[in-house]
UniProtKB/Swiss-Prot annotation:
First-listed, main subcellular location of the protein, grouped into a coarse class: secreted
Glycosylation sites: 106, 121, 193
Protein name: Extracellular metalloprotease AO090012001025
Single GO BP term: proteolysis
Keyword Signal belongs to the record: yes
Signal peptide: 1-23
Positions with a binding annotation for Zn(2+): 229, 233
Family, as annotated: Belongs to the peptidase M43B family.
Sorted UniProt keywords: Disulfide bond, Glycoprotein, Hydrolase, Metal-binding, Metalloprotease, Protease, Secreted, Signal, Zinc
EC numbers, comma separated: 3.4.24.-
Amino acid sequence: MSHFPTLHILILVIANLQIQCFAFVSQSRGFCATGPPTESLKAEYRRLSALGSQSYNPVDSESRAAITPIVIDTWFHIITGEAGTELISDEMIADQLSYLQNAYWNATISYRLQGVTRSANDTWARNEDEMAMKTVLRRGSYRTLNVYFHTDLQASPNAGARAFDIVRRELGVSQQQPTSMLGFCTLPDPSINASSPPSTYIKDGCNVLAETMPGGSLAHYNRGGTAIHEIGHWNGLLHTFEGESCSSDNEGDFIADTPQQSKPTEGCPAQKDSCPELPGFDAIHNFMDYSSDECYDSFTPDQVSRMRSMWFAMRDGK
């Protein structure tokens, strides 16, 4: 008897499993490749934590009015392949900026768009030759936010995103094969000062997959939440699950009012508690978790205080 039908069925089953794995991965924001904080940055987090949370209620209008507004000069760089120059519309750019303003409004942080550049370059669209790209495109000083929206953002084989190994393991992807990701961003660097030459911070900024912009094609991640998440890193925030441990030795994200969390969130569950022996549920609605866009809605008061403290300590005047 021929074994062809059995082999054919097996191939279909394997193909279906691969599709399911891709679907599983697409429900997880495991593609943020922002690296861990340096020891000097950890020391700054500890210093700020020791000072305690500022008396600030982000919902209280009087509290908001009493503090100095932070206005961040911002550049958006739209980078497409040569055959996809129409993929990112002006409406998508405007909607992303609007969401950015709304997400940080309670922190009294706003973003003053200085301009938008558009580049059609297949290499840059994949984030290859990043140094050359940013040397040409980057604008402003260390206090200026530059966001690069790539239509085909890729991770190098050495990138540090948590989900890359999961993807490769499940799908049998070669370690040499580049993997798509949602974004990454630089954390503040304590070594940068007002006299630092631009060459020392040329890579500063956020790289974001353009499909995650409002109206993009990536289901569950096309409301603009990835840019909010990545810019949170630029403002000095870590993942809510930093350290991925429930251990008392884990300093986590150095934020007092985010419950300890050992695993990133996938999708938008009704509730999740990855450290059940510790107080609080996982912050599934927090912009610094890995939840899907429909789940995102807030930063905590201590995260707000941390971003503001980091701005004045690390970026203002530089």
